[in-house]
């Protein structure tokens, strides 16, 4: 059993080092401005978010991702600023820390029509525990493991700066269409300099909300506490692709959602969301169920907490949707 776990972890580590793939959440719409820096300040108020994901929990050394964020509007809600910190840990071997700031500017094109432009800058602090790794040349024909390897790494840590840009079109806060590019300069991410770059990630997303109680469509100017929401997202980073579609309903104070996620090849996941909110507090739980034969540890969990400062006037849109 331990050999099987070790083999799985070795393959996973090789996959991460080879592709330099970003972490991902099942529901980025409750992970503030994680898909597009243009979505900074989209809640139209002060917003604090904390998100946690545990992946492959059936393995001995699983995968943990944590993100903390803050964003708000300034200057008549046309300018928005935000800051975030994320921590991504694979087993006890590979750890990624990212801290960054983001800015978005809203341009009014016509009544109810807006364009948002966003820019994000961040710094990465990556660490790998070289002492916990065993390389191929350390295995002898007798089954013994020699203490040293000929593999040469300059350092077990890596620090570099990164940038992202994004844009979105918003119609009355009911329909949002956006596109973003992360790792614009494709920074060097390797522990041996010049051998690995962090590939650009391209993101496209569409979000729609339909009021249920008041029968308001795209041209309504407000929302009741009951509404339907839907989301389409596509991400691509080098050879890695991910597409998902999600939908759900909100009946105050309960929010329910379901989504389907796929890498467009072999790995498919169905996610279920249960959420609730009271005044400015929101709490969500997401369960991922792998439906393909490549189960990668079978299932995953996500927990998200969001607090939004109550508005002095009625918000024009629900703060969060799937």
Where are these regions (language model features)?
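Cleavable N-terminal signal peptides
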Residues: 7-8, 18
